[in-house]
């Protein structure tokens, strides 16, 4: 990779689940990192732990509590130093909440991104890696999902991702100096192997495995499985689960692409998944095996809006980013349990809001 030394990367949402794992990898590679996060759905403790894990590179991390909609604060940060690139994770991400509070999501995710892009443009910073999502595929009629599959977000959260993708495409079309990579994640799972950082959803979890984790540590009595009559191997929904460390690697690969292929990059999109589908019951069984815990199940009807089968075609990322997921479901569940057993209340405590 082009030498990381003296390169400073701005990471928005860097205190969050995927952000914190990516920040750690950047530090370990020798980058300087400035993290911006408003801590709405993240904990500053994640940043403190990333510092500890980074060892002698900890001093290369600078944290600022900032909301991306605060243009004046952003402008001051960009005026104070030069950023080689921006990795943009920041945003609200609970699908269910987005249906109940659409304006909150449009305001936070869209206005925050517009403000960020305006300030980047004003300061001549035109390299961007953006966290998009497989939610932009909606309910795919065919799997695996390729980067050319039809886009049809089914909820306000997914629509914010799709609008931002379009915004990035329009931005590059208007000014080819912009070099942008859009990463469509599938379902992140697991934690850093140290068990020191991991997923800590403030409030109610949004995804399957944090629910499983809460049942395993005694915070919930049972896991509710929604839908047992899908046309799948065991009747439950199938998703493409990917280890968060593999996802972090994908961001490093995207950053490398922005540097090394700068002349050929426009606004590119890549799926980040394993290319394999795993059912809800298969994930539960793998977690039970990894943890030695029995997860009581309650079966319920399908939830409106849940797709039957979603998994990625990953050939483009493998070919162009030289990236491929290394870890399987067993490692995801092993590392998730290592984190959950050491941090049953995430970064909080039993009497905190977590």
From Swiss-Prot:
NAD(+) binds at residues 8-39. Pathway: Carbohydrate metabolism; galactose metabolism. It holds the Pfam family GDP_Man_Dehyd. The keyword NAD applies. Its cofactor is NAD(+). GO terms for molecular function: UDP-glucose 4-epimerase activity. It catalyses: UDP-alpha-D-glucose = UDP-alpha-D-galactose. GO terms for cellular component: cytosol. SUPFAM superfamilies: NAD(P)-binding Rossmann-fold domains (SSF51735). Gene3D superfamilies: NAD(P)-binding Rossmann-like Domain, UDP-galactose 4-epimerase, domain 1. CDD domains: UDP_G4E_1_SDR_e (cd05247). The active site is at 157 (proton acceptor). Substrate binds at residue 133. Catalyzes the interconversion between UDP-glucose and UDP-galactose. Belongs to the NAD(P)-dependent epimerase/dehydratase family. This is UDP-glucose 4-epimerase 1. It comes from Oryza sativa subsp. japonica.
